[in-house]
Amino acid sequence: YGMTEADFLSAELCCVPAFNACDIGFDRSFVGAYGHDDRVCSYPAYTALFEEASEEHTTMVVLADKEEIGSEGSTGMQCAIFTDLIDALAASFGAIGAEVRAHSKCLSADVNAGFDPNFKDVCEPLNSTFLSCGAGYAFTYPSPTGSRGKGGSNDASAEFVGEIRKLFNENGVVWQTGELGKVDVGGGGTVAKFIAKMNIDTVDIGVPVISMHSP
């Protein structure tokens, strides 16, 4: 390939499993795949964007990187490119970026930790999301994300959560709510808190998965 040892000093290399996605379970009810947590969120996000026929509102999808290390760097959700982009779009219409963000709504797509009977000690059974909870897709919007007493979480407003709940019910979306692991035992974070910091109403949404970071 014409590479030398020096090229590895600036190379960005990724080692990933080579096997294809497959059905898992006695009834083939589960999907097993590398990177399933990212793909199950990003694919419906951009297909919904492409299929949106209404021109009443401006819609966008942001696919960010580095979430597992705190959304740092120029490709993470803490980068200013998102606010810069909104400011540029607002300026083209003679609007103010801060006002546009205040009137914006965001669904932060990320998977939730589904209840796993093999590791049930880190979950709260009465406040967890479950796989195969009914027909269609099982969406969650866990407000109590975060860890260590739910520090670092995003607390969506009751009004916005109610708006999303009404939207789901009117469109036949199967949904459930649940926390991201038992308080002070399980836990995790999403990029929702960074978007909410921009004064954008934000709520987490995503399918529950198990074995989230396994190969």
Over which residues does each language-model region extend?
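Solvent-exposed alpha-helices and their adjacent loops that cap or buttress functional pockets
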Residues: 6-8, 22-24, 38, 50-55, ...
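Soluble metallo-hydrolase cores and metallopeptidase-like ectodomains found primarily
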Residues: 1-33, 51
